[in-house]
Amino acid sequence: MKLSLMVAISKNGVIGNGPDIPWSAKGEQLLFKAITYNQWLLVGRKTFESMGALPNRKYAVVTRSSFTSDNENVLIFPSIKDALTNLKKITDHVIVSGGGEIYKSLIDQVDTLHISTIDIEPEGDVYFPEIPSNFRPVFTQDFASNINYSYQIWQKG
């Protein structure tokens, strides 16, 4: 099973402030929606609760709480290991989509990074881990917006 990771990061490494993303760069969310369309997303409970279930996506939500969902496109797992074991049986590609603890736990296991770097330095309390040295950028596109940002694809190897 291929694991990808998608994240929006500020210039100072912030990815969140509590349950919120501390910016709104017009157009950047469209990248997320396009890349994750019809895909399985692996997320933590807090991230899932803050983003909600977007249409045309399936979710593997990792939580230690008693969180439940009636949505047929949401599976709930007590650990990342359980989620990955079960996802391998039903899909060949998963996009790791946050939050901070999920990224930290899986960044060394993913094959591809989809990173939007937002040209802002907000306050926040959730940070993205350091990109491992065995990843290399293979694509970059800059976007002018209300807050400028660049989108990069990084590959392992």
Swiss-Prot record:
Q: State one Pfam family annotation.
A: DHFR_1
Q: Cite the entry's keywords alphabetically.
A: Antibiotic resistance, Methotrexate resistance, NADP, One-carbon metabolism, Oxidoreductase, Plasmid, Transposable element, Trimethoprim resistance
Is the NADP keyword given for this protein? yes
Q: In which pathway does it act?
A: Cofactor biosynthesis; tetrahydrofolate biosynthesis; 5,6,7,8-tetrahydrofolate from 7,8-dihydrofolate: step 1/1
Q: Which CDD domains match?
A: DHFR
GO biological-process terms attached to the record: dihydrofolate metabolic process; folic acid metabolic process; one-carbon metabolic process; response to antibiotic; response to methotrexate; tetrahydrofolate biosynthetic process
**InterPro entries (alphabetical):** DHFR, DHFR-like_dom_sf, DHFR_CS, DHFR_dom
Q: What is its EC number?
A: 1.5.1.3
Instruction: Extract the GO molecular function terms from the UniProt entry.
Output: dihydrofolate reductase activity; NADP binding
Which enzyme class, named as a word?
oxidoreductase
Checking PANTHER family in the record gives: DIHYDROFOLATE REDUCTASE
Subunit info?
A: Homodimer.
Per the entry, what this protein does is:
Key enzyme in folate metabolism. Catalyzes an essential reaction for de novo glycine and purine synthesis, and for DNA precursor synthesis.
Similarity annotation:
Belongs to the dihydrofolate reductase family.
* NCBIfam families with a match to the protein in the record: trim_DfrA1_like (NF000330)
* Name used for this protein in its record: Dihydrofolate reductase type 1
Organism the protein comes from: Escherichia coli
Task: Name the gene.
Answer: dhfrI
